[in-house]
Amino acid sequence: MPLDNKVQLNENGKEVNNNNNNDEDLKIQDNHNNKEPFFNRSELVRLLIQSLNSLGYDKSAEFLEKDSGISLQSKEINQFSECVVSGDWNKVEELLPFLKLNEFDTNNVKFLVYSQKFLEYLENHKIKEALECLRLEITPYTKDTSRLQVLTSLIMTSNSSETKKQIKQRSSRVNLLDDIRKYVNPNIMLPENRLEQLIKQSIQYQMGKCLYHNTSEQFINLFKDHTCDKSQMPLDVLFTLKDKHRDEIWFITFSHDGQRLASSSKDNTIIIWDMSTIYLDQPTEPKVMFILLGHTKEVSHLSWSPNDKYLLSASNDSTVKLWNTNDGTLLKTFTKHSDAVTCCGWHPDNKRFVSGGNDKNIYLWSIENLDLTNSNNNNNNHNNNNSNINGNSINGSNNNGNNNNNISPIKSWACARVNDLSIHKDGKQLIIICQEKKLRIYDLENEKTPEVVLMETDAITSMELSNDCNFALVNTSNQEIHLWDLEKQIIVQKYRGHKQGRFVIRSCFGGVDQAFVLSGSEDSTIYIWHRSSGILLETLSRHSGTVNTVCWSPCNPFIFCSASDDQTIKVWSRSNNHNSFINNLTNK
């Protein structure tokens, strides 16, 4: 059919073709292989008209309508949209039949329209009219009493500043039109910015299939398919931090702002490193800020508070210690556990934390009412057999601090030996892994809520939550890493290739949008997988002992660190050493 022929739409928005040729659906032919595409030509033209309008090319859109003979929408639908935006509610109701809705959806749309009318009455302080609208127009079209209660409460508190703010936020005619579109056949009323949505979906699909996608570019070239090469991946060692820890390094973790790194070792010590210099255009080797002494046995786990003011350390000496990260002083020692403490983690309120251990107990602690002034009078004297290494300040103590033994947890849970734990970013759930091959999820706000149990087939040694806390990486003893969807409660991906059987090996998410999974291994190698596909991308062999733990910088997708039994920490970056990066990535 030639483009200048008039095309009519039926009542369902479908094209009516009055010609008798074989091109019934006006489909575009592929010039290369003469195959028909999967879309209708008139739909594409309508999307182009809509896009031209949204870009401000109204005259071009009008010309395309005339030249093609295809209308974006029927005149009644256009009039309906105009009336919604202008607030002509009587005309809106009159034009409702042209939306071709069933009775249920018609009632829902009427409820939306009358609710908008009600909110505008309140916004203009027309309380009497709002009450009449609620009683005569809104109530007949919903059986959901909770929705009515919300609107009624707005009347009762209409003079409060908070209610006025809510009314203003709710009473948007543009938002109303978007809500109405959800009920209408898209052939009749096109979804807003539909062509742009399709382009975004295409780009997101290409990015998802791009194995090495690790870029923060805001704009993607529409003239070619998106691909990334290895140049954006941190595959080269930038620095090797050595001669500070004197035994195996078991744990490392970045502060939330990425400017510091904490490491713990079998040598009973904790080191806080200044990492700010690795992000410079000309990076320099990180320096030791503090060496924290005080534990009498191996330190197996560390956790920064959400505001990075405090650091928790969990040790095989059965204690948890709380440190001031600004000066390295020991603030408190928590001694409730009767066996090695294997893990600890903060609540997002910065006031509470949890600890778990081999004594089969989990404790919830609060520091809110504790005296967190320097609890150790010897901290600032640098005695207790501490020495100053390379001029770096060393703080810490073998004392437990004043009255530490009187600190009691505010809550406890009994379970099997605890291997790892974490608190959801909303503070409502505690996720733990035990030696009984289970992930357990506890409700921290409601004790009556039954725990959720996710079963594994092998022992679970460690766990890492994604930034959105919807997914958990768990390392298992059968040399697999499993990605759990915590909402759907299923394993969505498995990662294989690394070696793990004798030791605790830790993995992490990393890169832009956490698109990669990174893990240490007992074969002295680091493994990198594509998160969504599970494809093994890289193996990095620069350590000379078991790689126990890895962590990716939270503020730069081109930096990660690894720690090993070889007593070193390696800082990894891109080969071109372009480490400067806008440190404003939002921590999810």
UniProtKB/Swiss-Prot annotation:
Residues 73-129 form the CTLH domain. It comes from the Eukaryota. Keywords: Repeat, WD repeat. Residues 1-32, 376-403 are annotated as: Disordered. SMART domains: CTLH, WD40. InterPro entries: CTLH_C (IPR006595), G-protein_beta_WD-40_rep (IPR020472), LisH (IPR006594), TPR1-like_2nd (IPR054080), WD40/YVTN_repeat-like_dom_sf (IPR015943), WD40_repeat_CS (IPR019775), WD40_repeat_dom_sf (IPR036322), WD40_rpt (IPR001680). Residues 40-72 form the LisH domain. One of its GO terms (biological process) is proteasome-mediated ubiquitin-dependent protein catabolic process. One of its GO terms (cellular component) is GID complex. WD repeats lie at residues 244-283, 294-333, 336-375, 413-452, 455-494, 499-539, 542-582. CDD domains: WD40 (cd00200). Gene3D superfamilies: YVTN repeat-like/Quinoprotein amine dehydrogenase (2.130.10.10). This is WD repeat-containing protein DDB_G0349043. It comes from Dictyostelium discoideum.
